[in-house]
Every structure is written in structure tokens, then in C-alpha cells.
Design a protein with these regions (language model features):
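Short, charged/polar micro-motifs that form catalytic or ligand-binding hotspots
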Residues: 3-8, 43, 47, 103-106, ...
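Acidic, Ser/Thr-rich peripheral helices and adjacent loops at domain boundaries
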Residues: 45-53, 186-200
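Short coil/turn segments at secondary-structure boundaries
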Residues: 71-76, 104, 173, 235-241
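Internal, well-folded beta-alpha domain core
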Residues: 101-194
Length: 256
């Protein structure tokens, strides 16, 4: 049994595909460095990430797959799930051997990659629905999130289109980065010292010293409205949890 080890990056995975074809091998698994090896592992091969090799593999995929299938691969990678590594590696290898297999759901690897991508896209939709902004005194709107998957890169266009006339910051507290829009361009940002930021990473609330007084009033009005429209006789907690999972509540105004 041959196992390939890589650095956990997309370029690393694509390099592994390049090396597998160059060496004429079909490794049983693709694992990240430090993962426990299977009991009957006979040989390991350390993949050295090479951007040029990765670029050539990606260009080759673009020639064989539809735009939709390429998007599926990119989206699945945003899941950050280790169990994706081997199925996605085999999926890409099969594309070069068999052509476009993106709709062959009888193939276990295609099905695994597709299902993971669908979970990411589902959370992308939920983020668009559940993000709550707060207005700071300087006019900037802040939203803090901590999604299961790394969906910020695929939701930013939505907010740039919808709120293109106001500055905002959407920050992923789980991955310690965000996107800031100044009214013209969007840039990716990180904070050297998160303890010094003027908001609480655990619930997304702005410090009282920087939150707009108008926003405080609107938050109270929104909570009042949310309670007022509730019809006790029609409460369905199970459906509410299904439509609005509890893990999102800590950042939602109406739940705090």
C-alpha cells in the first residue's frame, strides 16, 4: 500500500496528481503530514508542493471539465474537511484517465466530492440569510461569523453587490480573517492582535464605545418586532432549529 503525504493545500493536492502520473503510481490514500498511517502501509511518498505543476494540472482540468464541474471542485475544497483529500485526489486522477465524470454519481469519489460541495453551498446560502450587521460610529457595518466551512470567499460578491454604497467588514472569527469594503474595493484583512479589536469575537457585538446610537435603537426595535410577531400557538422549535441551526444564534440580534 502506497500513501502520498502532502501539505494540506490545494496546490499540494494538484502536485500530488502530477507526481502520481509522472511516477505511474496509483496511491491508495492522500494524507496530510502528521496523519496516522494505515496499519498495512508499505511505502510513503512525500509530495513537495510545486506551483507550476499545480498550475499545469489545473489548466488540464479546465480543458476536460465544464465550468460548473470546476466550480464544484473549488467549492468542495472550501469545506476544509480532511476526508475530502483522498476522494478529490482520485476524482481528479480519474478525470485525466476517463474524461468528464462529474455527473457519474455511481462513482463513490464523484459522489463524495459532490455531497461535500453541496454542504458548502448550503452554508453559503445560510450565511447570506443569517449575517447580521452592526453600525459603528464611523459608518462602517460589522458582521462576525464562524461558519463550519470557509465560505467567506464565495459570499463576498453578494454583499458587495447588495451593499455597494456603504463600508462594511465581515470577519470570520474561526479562521481569523475577514473582508473589508471601503465603498470601492474589497480587501482581505487579518488582525495582528485580536484582543485589541473593538468587538467581541464570541458574539460579534461591537463595543459600546464604538457602536452607533442609531444601531442600538434599531437592534432593540428588531428584538421587539421579532417577539411581537411570534404566535405562541404556532411555535415549532424543531422546525426552527432545522431552518436556523443553533450554532448561528450567537451572532443574531434577535437571539441575543
Amino acid at each position: 500500500m502506497t500513501i502520498y503525504l502532502f501539505d494540506g493545500t490545494m496546490d499540494g493536492l494538484l502536485t500530488a496528481v502530477f507526481d502520481a502520473f509522472s511516477l505511474k503510481e496509483q496511491p491508495e490514500e492522500l494524507l496530510t503530514e502528521g496523519d496516522a498511517l494505515p496499519l498495512f502501509c508499505e511505502r510513503t511518498y512525500q509530495v513537495t508542493t510545486d506551483e507550476e505543476k499545480a498550475r499545469r494540472v489545473w489548466t488540464g482540468l479546465e480543458k476536460k471539465l465544464t465550468r460548473e464541474a470546476m466550480k464544484l471542485i473549488s467549492v468542495s475544497w472550501l469545506s476544509e474537511q480532511k476526508e475530502l483529500n483522498t476522494p478529490l485526489f482520485r476524482y481528479v486522477c480519474k478525470v485525466f484517465r476517463q474524461g468528464d465524470i462529474s455527473r457519474n454519481y455511481a462513482d463513490a469519489d464523484v459522489l463524495a466530492v459532490t455531497n461535500i460541495a453541496r454542504k458548502v453551498l448550503h452554508e453559503q446560502l445560510r450565511m447570506k440569510q443569517f449575517i447580521r450587521f452592526q453600525k459603528a460610529k464611523d459608518g462602517t457595518y460589522l458582521a462576525v461569523v464562524s461558519p463550519d466551512h470557509n465560505v467567506l470567499p464565495i459570499i463576498i460578491d453578494h454583499f458587495q453587490d447588495r451593499f455597494n454604497d456603504q463600508p462594511w467588514l465581515i470577519y470570520d472569527a474561526k479562521r481569523h480573517y475577514g473582508f473589508n469594503y471601503d465603498g470601492k474595493t474589497v480587501i482581505r484583512i487579518t488582525f495582528e492582535d485580536e484582543s485589541a479589536v473593538p468587538f467581541d469575537l464570541t458574539n460579534g457585538k461591537l463595543d459600546e464605545s464604538v457602536i452607533s446610537s442609531d444601531d442600538q435603537l434599531l437592534q432593540n426595535l428588531w428584538r421587539t418586532y421579532f417577539k411581537a410577531i411570534c404566535i405562541k400557538e404556532r411555535l415549532n422549535p424543531r422546525k426552527q432549529l432545522n431552518d436556523m441551526p443553533r450554532r448561528y444564534w450567537k451572532y443574531m440580534t434577535e437571539k441575543n
